[in-house]
Structures are given as structure tokens and as C-alpha cells.
């Protein structure tokens, strides 16, 4: 049976922490697996299955949602397809089900490319590239977006990895988000406000146990140190997995579903809690609010980087 996510690009490298391995998918240029010294650091899923709850996929030219799939450009109303019909939103961009093509490969890296062609609601053309590379201290991901059309194009970018630390129950991990604001949403998960997290249950800067959280929430004002904002999960024994984003990743979505199909070893998936830490350059509904939205001029290129590293093992 052919994999539901197309070609599976298997990466391997020797690192100071031991052998590292990753699997990247042709469809959505997704991160299907990543491990160091045999310890899984992202939730994986069978090759014959679609990504559960968007696991690992690239979100472009917007992450999260656009209310009603509608946005207005200089007085012209644009209508996108409603890819989240239950909530009447356009969700997670235009390439989540698209195949990418290979443009570069080494044993420890792969570069994939896909084009966003002009279409209903998005009359622009973007060339997109993503490179996954196993490096000494983790996994580094580089996105390059280029406007190859004739008009300024609105763009934003995000990714959807679910992090873990081996067989440690997700509920026992401590989630830390380096974010200073929380984004309030309506019943359709679109922003209605943004408030400081100080003194609220959404202040995760000091960390909270994942099992005590029920989140599908956006956060802003990501605090960067040396050009990177860092969010983490920490196990009771002190081991941590850290997701970092460059200065473009000023927002993050945290999602803690309790009905994720957890895969353990070669066994059948079992339902359990997972945690996605989704770095984003813009929050939900950015095409309407303008928050974090980037307009690329014809011929302009934009590079965004993020990655995963580990500590304590």
C-alpha cells in the first residue's frame, strides 16, 4: 500500500548525543518522525495514515484560521475555500494536502519545494522551499518563500509538530511557553482580543503540567533571546525537548488534545493526550487583522527558521 503522505524521506546522522533519525513526507513536507539515540521527540504515525490532527505539516501561506474564508484586499472581497467547514473557516493554508518535489538531498538533510498557484481567494503565486537538516544539537528547518507573481502577496507561515520525550506520558511533561500575551477567541476559534498573560492561567512561562491543561490557544509576544524564542517540554527526570523559532516566529499555538492516536513502538495506536507546539509568524485571521502578516513584493524572498533540540540526554 502506498503511503498516504507520499514518498518518505528518511534522514540519518551521527550526533554527539548518538544517532539521529527523521522522516519527512512528500505531502505537506511534514515531519513524520524524529528521534535521537532511539528516543522519539515527536509524535509519529503510520506511513499509511494521513497526519492525525495536522501532525508535522507545513502551514503556508497562512497558519491557523481565516474567518469565513473571507478577507478584503484594497476593497476587493476574496473568498477562500472553507477547509474547516464545521467552523466555517479556511484553515492551515493551501499546501497541507499538496505534494512537494525533492530539490536537494544528503544522508542527513532533504530540501523540498512546492508552488502556491493563483486560485480562488488567493490570486498570487509563491514558490516555497523547506529544508530539514539533522545537525549536532538537533533538527534545523529552513523555509524560503518567494513571490514569483506580479503583485504584492500576503504571506504567513507556521508548522504543526507534536513534541514528546520517548515513552514519558505526555500528561507528566511540563510545558513552558515563552509568550507574554494570550489571544482570546470566539466560538469559531477566531481572535477577538489579545491580553497579557500575567496573573492568568495562560502564563506558561514558568511551566505547567500538560495533564492539567486543555489548550487550543494562540499566544503572542514571544520573548526572544539571541534571536530565538524557545518553548519546551520537560520530563520529571529533567530531560527536555525544546522548540525554537527565529525572530519571525512571534506567535505560537499550543494544542493539547486528549484523543490523539499515540503510536508506541510497532504497536497499534492508542488514544491519549498529545501536545503540539506550533510556531507561527502570524496568528489566526491575520489576513483580516494584519497582525504578523508579511507582504512580499514581486521577486522578494523571505526566509524563516525553526528547529528542535534536546537537553539532558
Sequence positions of predicted segments:
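Acidic, contiguous internal or C-terminal segments within carbohydrate-active enzymes
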Residues: 13, 21-22, 116-167
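Extended, loop-rich substrate-binding clefts of extracytoplasmic carbohydrate-active enzymes
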Residues: 1-3, 81-136
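Short Pro-Gly-centered flexible turn/kink motifs
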Residues: 71-79, 143, 295-312
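Acidic-aromatic substrate-binding/catalytic surfaces of carbohydrate-active enzymes
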Residues: 21-77, 82-84
